């Protein structure tokens, strides 16, 4: 019921995380459904070990545990689950800040500027470079930029996640990449005219279909980033988040105020 309410509110990303957590816990339990009675201290401890044995990172394990805790707490509030003092006390629900996300400087330079000798990887590289040059812009924000967002040498947009209005200067080094990636197809009537051809811009779809299209585009981009990193012989893992955190780390070392970095991220 709670996941259904999240969908009605348009919070598809949050609903997706809850669904993933429940799907994972059902796999551990070996059942098609999960009851509150299956969420016990012993079960949770074994479930945590189960996740680690499958190679999940501490922060992913924590996310799944926090989703289960939230669901259980809602069950307690509604009277459908018994209150158990510190039920989740023995499992990890924190955030491991030691998980490095920024690339070393030499690998970052290779990722963004070394020729991968492949047209489709050059396109991936150009998208990554724009994300970096646009102050660590998220892939979601880049994908949803419309042609009207670009006004002379400035891009104006609202963050997808927070709706915060933002603006970034387009440097000369970014202009060629924008020209290379620019969507030259006319938009359909009453549909967004996206600057880049990452999304289709079909407003006739339901919102959840649009969310699924974005998730598909994100998975594709992350797969392409892995291919780019492999072609350039990088040893560090690379995702869209890597680019954002690499920009933040670079900006910090160059003396950019933390407040400005946090606002961009």
Name these PLM-found stretches:
Residues 85-139, 143:
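Basic, Lys/Arg- and aromatic-enriched nucleic-acid-binding interface segment
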Residues 108, 171-235:
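Active-site/catalytic core of tyrosine-dependent DNA strand-transfer enzymes
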Residues 144-183:
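Conserved tyrosine-mediated DNA breakage-rejoining catalytic core shared by Y-recombinases
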Residues 117, 213, 222-263:
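Short, basic (Lys/Arg/His-rich) helix/loop patches that form interaction surfaces
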